[in-house]
Protein backbone atom coordinates (compact mmCIF):
# COMPACT_ATOMS: atom_id res chain seq x y z
CA UNK A 1 0.00 0.00 0.00
CA UNK A 2 1.26 3.44 -0.87
CA UNK A 3 0.67 6.59 1.14
CA UNK A 4 -1.19 9.17 -0.94
CA UNK A 5 -3.07 12.40 -0.31
CA UNK A 6 -3.05 15.48 1.91
CA UNK A 7 -4.76 15.65 5.31
CA UNK A 8 -5.06 18.18 8.14
CA UNK A 9 -5.40 16.34 11.46
CA UNK A 10 -4.59 18.06 14.75
CA UNK A 11 -1.93 17.36 17.35
CA UNK A 12 -3.28 17.00 20.86
CA UNK A 13 -1.70 18.59 23.94
CA UNK A 14 0.45 15.47 24.52
CA UNK A 15 1.94 15.49 21.02
CA UNK A 16 -0.24 12.69 19.68
CA UNK A 17 -1.50 12.75 16.12
CA UNK A 18 -4.34 10.82 14.52
CA UNK A 19 -3.17 9.43 11.22
CA UNK A 20 -5.63 8.91 8.37
CA UNK A 21 -7.35 5.53 8.72
CA UNK A 22 -6.10 4.35 5.33
CA UNK A 23 -2.47 4.84 6.50
CA UNK A 24 -2.78 2.79 9.66
CA UNK A 25 -2.65 -0.77 8.31
CA UNK A 26 0.75 -0.16 6.72
CA UNK A 27 2.10 1.10 10.07
CA UNK A 28 0.71 -1.73 12.20
CA UNK A 29 4.11 -3.46 12.41
CA UNK A 30 5.80 -0.34 13.74
CA UNK A 31 7.09 3.00 12.57
CA UNK A 32 10.00 5.38 12.85
CA UNK A 33 9.68 9.18 12.92
CA UNK A 34 12.70 11.16 11.69
CA UNK A 35 13.69 14.67 10.76
CA UNK A 36 13.13 15.32 7.09
CA UNK A 37 14.39 17.86 4.63
CA UNK A 38 12.78 21.32 4.57
CA UNK A 39 12.02 20.99 8.31
CA UNK A 40 9.25 18.45 7.97
CA UNK A 41 9.04 15.11 9.78
CA UNK A 42 9.04 11.75 8.03
CA UNK A 43 7.05 8.75 9.28
CA UNK A 44 8.44 5.51 7.87
CA UNK A 45 7.02 2.01 8.23
CA UNK A 46 9.78 0.19 10.13
CA UNK A 47 10.67 -2.06 7.19
CA UNK A 48 11.03 0.91 4.82
CA UNK A 49 13.16 2.76 7.38
CA UNK A 50 15.42 -0.28 7.66
CA UNK A 51 15.88 -0.25 3.86
CA UNK A 52 16.79 3.45 4.03
CA UNK A 53 19.19 2.70 6.89
CA UNK A 54 20.90 -0.03 4.84
CA UNK A 55 21.32 2.39 1.93
CA UNK A 56 22.78 5.01 4.26
CA UNK A 57 25.20 2.49 5.75
CA UNK A 58 26.25 1.22 2.32
CA UNK A 59 27.74 4.62 1.44
CA UNK A 60 31.33 4.95 2.67
CA UNK A 61 31.57 7.07 5.80
CA UNK A 62 34.57 8.76 4.20
CA UNK A 63 32.02 10.72 2.17
CA UNK A 64 31.14 13.79 4.24
CA UNK A 65 27.58 14.05 2.89
CA UNK A 66 26.96 10.41 3.83
CA UNK A 67 28.15 11.04 7.38
CA UNK A 68 25.98 14.13 7.66
CA UNK A 69 22.92 12.32 6.30
CA UNK A 70 23.40 9.33 8.62
CA UNK A 71 23.87 11.54 11.67
CA UNK A 72 20.72 13.54 11.05
CA UNK A 73 18.67 10.48 10.06
CA UNK A 74 19.62 8.31 13.03
CA UNK A 75 20.22 10.85 15.81
CA UNK A 76 16.76 12.33 15.45
CA UNK A 77 14.94 9.04 14.88
CA UNK A 78 12.22 7.89 17.26
CA UNK A 79 10.74 4.39 17.06
CA UNK A 80 7.06 4.19 17.73
CA UNK A 81 3.78 2.42 17.21
CA UNK A 82 0.17 3.30 16.66
CA UNK A 83 -1.89 3.34 19.84
CA UNK A 84 -5.32 1.70 19.98
CA UNK A 85 -6.95 4.89 18.68
CA UNK A 86 -4.67 5.09 15.62
CA UNK A 87 -2.46 7.87 16.95
CA UNK A 88 1.29 8.25 16.91
CA UNK A 89 3.27 10.13 19.52
CA UNK A 90 5.62 12.77 18.18
CA UNK A 91 8.48 13.45 20.59
CA UNK A 92 8.97 17.04 21.73
CA UNK A 93 12.37 17.49 20.01
CA UNK A 94 10.85 16.41 16.69
CA UNK A 95 7.86 18.72 17.16
CA UNK A 96 10.28 21.56 17.87
CA UNK A 97 12.42 20.75 14.81
CA UNK A 98 9.38 20.90 12.53
CA UNK A 99 7.76 23.85 14.39
CA UNK A 100 4.61 21.80 14.92
CA UNK A 101 1.79 23.17 17.00
CA UNK A 102 -1.81 22.00 17.02
CA UNK A 103 -2.41 22.46 13.28
CA UNK A 104 -0.41 20.17 10.96
CA UNK A 105 -0.46 18.95 7.38
CA UNK A 106 0.09 15.24 6.72
CA UNK A 107 0.99 14.17 3.19
CA UNK A 108 1.46 10.74 1.68
CA UNK A 109 4.65 10.41 -0.36
CA UNK A 110 4.35 6.83 -1.66
CA UNK A 111 6.52 4.83 0.80
CA UNK A 112 6.51 7.38 3.62
CA UNK A 113 4.42 10.07 5.30
CA UNK A 114 5.52 13.65 5.86
CA UNK A 115 4.23 15.92 8.62
CA UNK A 116 4.48 19.67 8.05
CA UNK A 117 3.75 22.91 9.80
CA UNK A 118 0.92 24.40 7.66
CA UNK A 119 2.74 27.68 6.92
CA UNK A 120 5.92 25.88 5.86
CA UNK A 121 3.89 23.48 3.74
CA UNK A 122 2.10 26.31 1.91
CA UNK A 123 5.41 28.08 1.24
CA UNK A 124 7.14 24.91 0.08
CA UNK A 125 4.16 23.72 -1.94
CA UNK A 126 3.81 27.05 -3.78
CA UNK A 127 7.44 26.87 -4.92
CA UNK A 128 7.20 23.19 -5.79
CA UNK A 129 3.99 23.75 -7.78
CA UNK A 130 5.72 26.46 -9.83
CA UNK A 131 8.61 24.09 -10.58
CA UNK A 132 6.18 21.27 -11.36
CA UNK A 133 4.40 23.48 -13.89
CA UNK A 134 7.72 23.99 -15.71
CA UNK A 135 8.31 20.25 -16.12
CA UNK A 136 6.45 20.00 -19.40
CA UNK A 137 9.41 18.69 -21.39
CA UNK A 138 11.04 16.13 -19.12
CA UNK A 139 9.64 14.27 -16.11
CA UNK A 140 11.44 15.10 -12.88
CA UNK A 141 12.18 11.45 -12.14
CA UNK A 142 14.34 10.88 -15.23
CA UNK A 143 17.95 11.84 -15.62
CA UNK A 144 19.38 14.11 -18.34
From Swiss-Prot:
One of its GO terms (biological process) is negative regulation of DNA-templated transcription initiation. The keyword Transcription regulation applies. Gene3D superfamilies: Transcriptional regulator MraZ domain (3.40.1550.20). Residues 6-48, 77-120 form the SpoVT-AbrB domain. Pfam families: MraZ. GO terms for cellular component: cytoplasm; nucleoid. Its main location: cytoplasm. InterPro entries: MraZ, MraZ_C, MraZ_dom, MraZ_N, MraZ_sf, SpoVT-AbrB_dom, SpoVT-AbrB_sf. Keywords: Cytoplasm, DNA-binding, Repeat, Transcription, Transcription regulation. It is found in: Cytoplasm, Nucleoid. HAMAP family: MraZ. Forms oligomers. Belongs to the MraZ family. This is Transcriptional regulator MraZ. It comes from Nocardioides sp. (strain ATCC BAA-499 / JS614). The lineage of its organism: Bacteria, Bacillati, Actinomycetota, Actinomycetes, Propionibacteriales. The gene is mraZ.
